Regions:
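An alpha-helical, amphipathic repeat domain used for nucleic-acid recognition
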Residues: 1-118
Length: 118
């Protein structure tokens, strides 16, 4: 996978855009570990490691943080995670994770919403 662009963000955060159209957030230290440079290549092995060791864990923590303050629908949570720059497969993994603990339940959300807005 070729790295098309590296966009600097706040607090040492980068957004890496790949030629395939994927983009993902990563910190400068992690990018240096994988020797990411514009125009450089990212091996499939490195990509799989980044997904499992960095992005999945971070997206799960982010989902829990988002749900900590108020209940949300699956759609709302998906939208928030996508706004944070996570790829769709990572977003789905994080949603499946929080659903496994019943932290996201659209039926319960709808019942609660109706109960409080009658």
């Amino acid at each position: 996978m070729q790295i098309q662009e590296i966009i600097k963000g706040k607090k040492g955060k980068l957004t890496i855009r790949l030629e395939e159209g994927l983009s993902f957030p990563i910190y400068e230290k992690e990018a240096a570990k994988y020797r990411m440079t514009e125009g450089g290549f990212l091996s499939d092995q490195d990509w799989n490691e980044i997904c499992t060791e960095i992005l999945e864990k971070r997206a799960k923590r982010r989902a829990l943080y988002i749900l900590q303050r108020m209940e949300r629908t699956e759609y709302q949570l998906r939208k928030k995670l996508q706004e944070n720059g996570y790829p769709e497969e990572i977003v789905q993994c994080a949603i499946d994770y929080v659903k496994s603990f019943h932290y996201v339940d659209d039926y319960r959300y709808a019942c609660t919403y109706i109960r409080y807005h009658q």
